[in-house]
């Protein structure tokens, strides 16, 4: 049993399709909204929605921070997730970290997307590669969390 619970951590989950329906219901046209250049994430942070994105971010962090760790990731998606988990369960998985995305190719190819997979992937890649922050540790937003104690127990937050 887990020593803490997260049952209250999420209030709602929406797919892009549901978000689009809300926009339509409230007559919101995203193309008429003022454009804002959001460039506070590294290319690695922006790629979390694609299979292998989290693994790439961790590899970049390990390389840049100099931390010594035996990182043997197994990025997997789609039906391969079940096979990967079964191999891990019986001790036959060659890695020590599983990045599992239930949707083949990651969230960008999920059931709730509103664009064809190839078009979504191309747009995703173009936007992500346009970022000026090319390393995890170069993200200035991290400075806002320097005082966060990652060793605390959840009961200490109360």
Question: For each of these PLM feature ranges, what is it?
Answer:
Residues 1-158:
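Iron-sulfur-associated redox domains of electron-transfer enzymes in respiratory
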């Amino acid at each position: 049993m887990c020593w803490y619970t997260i049952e209250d951590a999420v209030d709602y989950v929406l797919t892009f399709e549901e978000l689009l329906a809300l926009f339509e219901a409230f007559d919101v046209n995203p193309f008429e909204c003022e454009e804002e250049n959001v460039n506070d994430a590294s290319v690695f942070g922006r790629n979390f929605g694609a299979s292998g994105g989290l693994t790439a971010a961790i590899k970049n962090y390990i390389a840049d921070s100099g931390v010594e760790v035996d990182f043997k990731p197994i990025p997997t998606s789609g039906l391969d997730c079940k096979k990967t988990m079964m191999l891990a369960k019986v001790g036959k998985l060659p890695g020590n970290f599983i990045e599992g995305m239930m949707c083949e190719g990651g969230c960008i190819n999920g059931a709730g997307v509103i664009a064809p997979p190839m078009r979504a992937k191309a747009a995703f890649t173009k936007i992500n590669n346009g970022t000026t922050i090319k390393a995890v540790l170069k993200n200035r937003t991290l400075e806002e969390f320097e005082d966060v104690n990652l060793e605390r127990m959840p009961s200490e937050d109360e």
